[in-house]
């Protein structure tokens, strides 16, 4: 009888003992970043001993592509709709012709030096629009005290992604003084141009970037095709560590694999900016950014549908909407 009572007491006390032990263990564990660190005045003395890690060069929001899947990335073109779109398209085509001509890219055979120099220059420009758009939407959210609904993060991640393209290419080749000077001048011009343009017409800037990314996909597709056909034989076939970490590439990844993932990034920016331009055109710039759901959990797209509506129903309505939109494109 005594043993039965003892066993019941032990069984009843077990949860309390377990909770107490866990609490004590939790209390005993000092947090890595907590009040002790927050109450300090400076961490200046730690700067000389902080290790340099390539993984810290970017945020954790990194692209994850399947190499076989992105082999199917296609060259696409969205036809201009109206004066704003036409102006954006003509501007991009003019910029491409001027750059291809003065950089001599369109003359002679394709070489590794031409490709890397071209990418170095263009990626310094490509990282500007996302930062400008993200900054202005950030200021707008503060000014009007309203939620941004996911646009800012997508634009800033785009800017960071383009910068990581640049960080990769400078590991393959360091630009000379003339190229560095031209980059500084071009960046200043593009920043001021895009800043003013975004204040006046965000639709124009997003459409401009969409067409710019169309050209980028064309360029990178041409590079991949030249490698496949043997017209371009890369000597720098080892992918830099910063690229392997950022895109989660294997150690035996090739220069072609690198171009493949960068092309996929540009294709994503292409559809994102064309979508944002379409949203401005339809006065939906204050709506939720669809890519915050599409890229992470597409099933949520159907969670807000009326009761009884199925995924198939939503898809058919989406097809009708796309058809109607295409009539105006």
Swiss-Prot record:
Leading EC class: oxidoreductase
Keyword presence, Transit peptide: yes
CDD domains named among the record's database cross-references: AOX (cd01053)
InterPro entries: AOX, AOX_sf
Highest taxon in the source lineage: Eukaryota
Cofactor(s) of this protein: Fe cation
GO biological process: alternative respiration
Major localization listed first in the record, in broad terms: mitochondrion
Bilayer topology annotation: Multi-pass membrane protein
Keyword Mitochondrion recorded: yes
UniProt remark on cofactor binding: Binds 2 iron ions per subunit.
GO cellular component, one term: mitochondrion
Regions that span the bilayer: 115-135, 181-201
Pfam families: AOX
Region (Disordered): 300-329
Gene Ontology MF term list: alternative oxidase activity; ferric iron binding; oxidoreductase activity
Enzyme Commission number(s): 1.-.-.-
Binding site for Fe cation 2: 162, 213, 266, 269
Keywords for this protein: Disulfide bond, Electron transport, Iron, Membrane, Metal-binding, Mitochondrion, Mitochondrion inner membrane, Oxidoreductase, Respiratory chain, Transit peptide, Transmembrane, Transmembrane helix, Transport
Subcellular localization: Mitochondrion inner membrane
Binding locations of Fe cation 1: 123, 162, 165, 266
Subunit structure: Homodimer; disulfide-linked.
Entry's family note: Belongs to the alternative oxidase family.
Protein function: Catalyzes cyanide-resistant oxygen consumption. May increase respiration when the cytochrome respiratory pathway is restricted, or in response to low temperatures.
Protein name: Alternative oxidase, mitochondrial
Protein source organism: Trypanosoma brucei brucei
